[in-house]
Amino acid sequence: MKPYNISHMIMSIGNHKKNYVMKINVVSIFIVLLALTSCVNNSTSKRNKNMDTLNLTQKWDKTFPKSDKVEHTKVTFHNRYGIALAADLYKPQNAQGRLAAIAVSGPYGAVKEQVSGRYAQTLAEYGFLTIAFDPSYYGESGGTPRNLTSPEISTEDFSAAVDYLSVRKDVDAQRIGILGICGWGGFALNAAANDPRIKATVTSTMYDMSRVNANGYFDKMTVDDRYELRKKLSEQRTEDYLAGNYERDGGVVNPVPEDAPLFVKQYHDYYKTERGYHRRSPNSNDGINKTATLAFINMPILSYIEEIRSAVLLVHGEQAHSRYFSEDAFKRLKGENKEILIIPGANHTDLYLSLIHISEP
């Protein structure tokens, strides 16, 4: 992939007293959340007694090497549904004071040991306190049934991460941003529209999961197609109820048919090989619950993105099959602090592995 530089990308983020600017220099892909208002927050978090108890793996089991530039710890927090979420926290070595913080999640069907952890660790090397979290029902996080997604709860998880970060004594609560990858890019935008505590939002290789489930790729589904899909999935609900469990969608197809679309082959090249396989990843194994699609068909997640007032950066590959999701979302954003970055020559999954290099202009 050919490097792409932005030497003078300015996002102004202000309050009633001052305006601050963020300069972003990106080689390959990424963002920086800088120079926001400082504040003091002495709150402490009280554990929710109704929260799930999690059994977290303490060994390093990521799909990427551990950095010697950051401290790594396992942490947990909970969303407002009482679901306990597991996260990897990355903090610069010898960091002092209150830091800007970023919560990272995605891709859709992935776990924190894959792409989101790679992003979070890299950002921590550049001075941020970051968490990469498993969404509800995924990986080491709580919630049943397993391998479920939800337009509401998957969005809520980002705000839950902000809850957690905002009460940490080493985080500046006025300098918290979120980063969503693939399907979690759409959830990140949805969270930003609903939660003014989020001061900047970045999406990487974004999917609008409501749109793709309701309309198919490139919006090719008809009303009749959608009816037949609803009928099939509703019948699956009956089968699941009788069986006492939930049928999975099978994850990334394996082996890949020769006539499969190129992006399916690219997914396989990541999730089903040593590049990205992880034993807790739905995509790497048996997938998401089939009936999860029903909620997305009926509940659009990007209804209010025009009302986002904080900074937004959308990053996508030039050759990605999913590029239109970012471009269409960008057209709808009304805020002054918005940018879209198209990476020349990159496909959807190139942005899963391309490390981010952030430097001063």
Residue map of PLM features:
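N-terminal cap/lid segment of alpha/beta-hydrolase-fold proteins
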Residues: 53-96
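The serine-hydrolase catalytic nucleophile loop
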Residues: 109-121, 135
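Conserved alpha/beta-hydrolase
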Residues: 122-140
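Alpha/beta-hydrolase active-site loop
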Residues: 148-169
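Alpha/beta-hydrolase-fold enzymes
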Residues: 189-272
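Short beta-strand/loop motif that positions the catalytic acidic residue
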Residues: 308, 314-316
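Catalytic histidine-centered segment of alpha/beta-hydrolase-like enzymes
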Residues: 346-355
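Residue-level detector of conserved catalytic or cofactor/ligand-binding positions
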Residues: 356-361
